[in-house]
């Protein structure tokens, strides 16, 4: 999977480190509905796509994936002191991942929630899941959300988070300290 070359004008040349976390069932990419998940053949292919896109943005991407909530919690605890923000696809933890959400919230770092599908779409919608909308336990504390755009949701989240990290006034710094 190749990414397209593009130019984004950033207000900083700082090389942010952004952690991308993929939760349970993301290891099954390539075996799931093409309508929802597109042509990504594997989780490794997705990771490479996001990492390459990060290089174009001038940021470092660190990928982590697990089918186990405890492993994800340990990763968040271990990485919080060295990363600048998180992108998470909670996947199988979307409705039950309170522990992961709390751990992310405790880091006080920006968090982008991503989904291949539009989890808020009604049943049968073009980018929705077959069963209709679901309520994410992450959405109400996420800094931002990108969903319904397959792997492009990750690229949009990476772009938005990078630009937000560059803009000190956006993520809470007093406006006079830019």
Predicted regions and their residues:
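Short, glycine-/small-residue-rich phosphate/pyrophosphate-handling segment
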Residues: 63, 121-175
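Glycine- and acidic-residue-enriched helix-capping/strand-helix junction motifs
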Residues: 29-44
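Short amphipathic alpha-helices and their capping/turn segments at secondary-structure boundaries
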Residues: 2-19, 101-104
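Short glycine-rich anion-binding loops that position phosphate/pyrophosphate groups of nucleotides
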Residues: 24-26, 91-94, 117-119
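Short, acidic/small-residue loops that bind anionic groups at enzyme active sites
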Residues: 104-124
């Amino acid at each position: 999977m190749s990414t397209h070359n593009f130019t984004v004008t950033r207000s900083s040349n700082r090389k942010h480190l952004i952690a991308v976390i993929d939760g349970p069932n993301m290891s099954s990419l390539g075996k799931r509905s093409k309508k929802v998940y597109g042509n990504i053949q594997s989780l490794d292919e997705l990771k490479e796509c996001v990492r390459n896109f990060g290089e174009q943005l001038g940021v470092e991407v660190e990928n982590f994936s697990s089918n186990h909530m405890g492993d994800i919690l340990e990763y968040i605890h271990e990485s919080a002191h060295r990363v600048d923000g998180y992108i998470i696809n909670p996947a199988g933890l979307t409705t039950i991942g309170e522990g992961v959400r709390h751990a992310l919230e405790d880091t006080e770092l920006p968090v982008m929630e991503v989904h291949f599908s539009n989890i808020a779409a009604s049943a049968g919608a073009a980018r929705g899941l077959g069963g209709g909308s679901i309520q994410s336990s992450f959405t109400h504390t996420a800094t931002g959300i990108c969903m319904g755009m397959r792997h492009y949701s990750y690229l949009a989240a990476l772009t938005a988070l990078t630009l937000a990290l560059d803009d000190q006034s956006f993520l809470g710094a007093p406006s006079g300290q830019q």
